[in-house]
Amino acid sequence: LDSITIVSPRYPPYVGGVETHVSQLAKRATKFFRKVSVITTDPLGHLPAVQEVDDYLTIFRIRSLAPRENYHFPSPSGLFKAMRQSHPQVLHLHCIHDVPGPIAGIMRGNSSMIFTPHYVGRLNSGLGRILFGAYRPFISELVEHVPRIICISRFEARLMINTFPGSAGRVEIIPNGIASDLREKNQWREPEEPTILFAGRLERYKNVDKVMRAVAKLREKNDKLRLRIVGRGPIKGELEQLSHTLGLVGSVDWYDRLPQSELFPLYASSTAVVLASEYENWGNTVAEAIGVGVPTIVANTSSLAEFVEEGLAVPVEPPIDDLKLAAKIGEVIDDPKKFSPKGMRSPLIISWDEAAEKTFAPCMSLVNS
């Protein structure tokens, strides 16, 4: 095939789940397309407007407004110019909750389309609810015209079909991949001192405060227990203050957003990874942690329940509170090897090569149709 353009609100060097997803697929798209382009935003204007990467990828970065880094409003003229320059045969749009992908869908011309919505079914800010409510009719029209809608979990697929009934029959499920090289280099071994890891955006719904309270409770009997928190977000300052209140100063290691090359060694050297959020359309950190074999504790709801169903993760039943978390974390740190998923196989744990094959191999029939 000749060309594909992937449109995403953000792209590395920014760090996050969508950024990882898009960059991993873009690297592998050259196996299927002669020309690969990414259109993304650069709110601060500090990065090159056009960047060639190793002769296989062109990145177009458009100035945008980005209130609280949650929503990205690109320059319409900049987006139109990048679309015209990339001239895609296939247009792969990302993020139903943000602006660039759906707007690029308006400008699609004769391009065949793929849509990966990263849909969570709810929004955590007033601006998000207003924005999504305003352009939902347009999104519905876009969804009606996209021949392939790729969701990353059964949970997300159900949300899409319930919200946009017209998408039924065109939704397929392709889980996010795992970096095979990092997985192989960072296989889990039980650490000498018990260490709990959370990695993700620091939002209230992630229940990191409850994880901290659970760790504080467990430290009453085991003062060697430590907590690692990786990420940034609007409640980081609040969580740092909570660490003082709970007497956890010196027992919590704080990390900013980390590249995967630095995150995987943290997985491999932790006693357990915890994601206590009750609402996730996928769990990148969960899949990665399971891939390296670390015991992984999750809220038994939303997409995270799929890992429990596969026997890969340790469940905490909702509603989540610190007492339930403390009980489950305590059970795991008493005998971590008993709960390790090391060596287990599942269709939820795939490589990025497999994810790219499933995503791009059908594009020939898409273009021909």
Q: Where on the chain are the PLM-derived regions?
A:
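Nucleotide-sugar donor phosphate/pyrophosphate-binding loop at the beta->alpha transition
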Residues: 112, 122-142, 180
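Carbohydrate-associated surface elements
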Residues: 155, 177
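Nucleotide-activated donor-binding/catalytic signature segment of Leloir-type glycosyltransferases, i.e.
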Residues: 240-258
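Short alpha-helical donor nucleotide-sugar binding micro-motif in glycosyltransferases
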Residues: 257-258, 265-270
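Aromatic "clamp/platform" in nucleotide-sugar-dependent glycosyltransferases that forms part
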Residues: 278
